[in-house]
Amino acid sequence: NSYYGYYFMINLRPHQAQIVDILKHHSKGQVIVPTGGGKTMCMIKDAQREFNSCSWDVILKDPDRKTIVIVAPRILLAQQLCEDFTKHLEAHHMLQYKVLHVHSGETHYESTTKVNTICDWVKDNYRFNKLIFTTYHSLRRIQQAEIDVDTIYFDEAHNSVQKNFVEATEYFSMYANRCYFFTATPKHSKTPFKIGMNDYDIYGRVLVNVPAPKLVQEGHILPPKVNIRKIDVVDDSRFKHEHDCDHVVSTIDEIDIDKVLICARSTKQIVNLVSQTDFCIELRSRGYSWMYITAKTGAVVDGKKVDRECFFNTLNEWGKDDTKKFV
């Protein structure tokens, strides 16, 4: 009956179904999943179950709904998580959910870093399920708001052990009804003077640890393959950008891959590559589009400045297109 909540069509892989079932029976703990193993879908499926946990009769008597917080290490990832959640959570009739972002980034959803505004938003939307997306830097704002949190997911949870984030992490570990730490690379501490994810009072025990070889064997992720290229060092900084261009273009020609990710040392290196060399011309001559995004420059697609939402929509569209070549 559609009046009783949401309708979700999420097909889980076996290890994801195992994780979701484990979360059902534990209120706190660590979920160790290799990169590409689908941690986000586990969060979404668990959130679906939480949103559907009350029947309509109960809601009429007690309209307080679930509040779920999702923590990401960076604003861009918080926005991407929001897109993933909202894409899969389809509301039906009166049981709609509301979305709030607590960080300084741009979003077309309601957004704030003010404690009083967070409190007011929660009170104003008490009849709705609530999703709050934030970063580790801004999590303390939600802590200061002292709102009731039913479930909190820490994405890339190894970031939470940083000195500036420990207080808020410990707070929600203690006061949230359900608290889960998702990561592919748990960070432990060998000294009692520094917090690590082996502090089980804060992080709980490891609920599930999915081995990477298992996912490789089942075809869910690809094993890493490393090819090392030797390049000549250029002492004259005047030619460094051209050297970067020649190196990257020749590598693209050699590997002959349609979709390429380039990791640069800095924003300056990216800007110099696309503006001070023939890199973009070389890409176009080979049938490649190009895009980049940094905190300093914002998002650019084929030389045109776009907003973050357009950037990620384009990235998803190109990524799904087997015929599209892009860097």
Task: Tell me what each language-model feature is.
Residues F8-I32:
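Conserved pre-motif I regulatory segment
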Residues T67-A78, T251-F279:
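Conserved strand-helix element at the start of the C-terminal RecA-like helicase core
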Residues L77-S111:
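Conserved helix-turn-beta segment of the N-terminal RecA-like "Helicase ATP-binding" lobe
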Residues L131-T151, S160-E167:
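Conserved RecA-like ASCE ATPase "motif II neighborhood" in helicase/translocase motors
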Residues Q162-I221:
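Post-DEXD/H (motif II) to motif III coupling segment of the RecA-like Helicase ATP-binding lobe
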Residues R205-S266:
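Conserved interdomain linker/interface between the two RecA-like ATPase lobes of SF2 helicase motors
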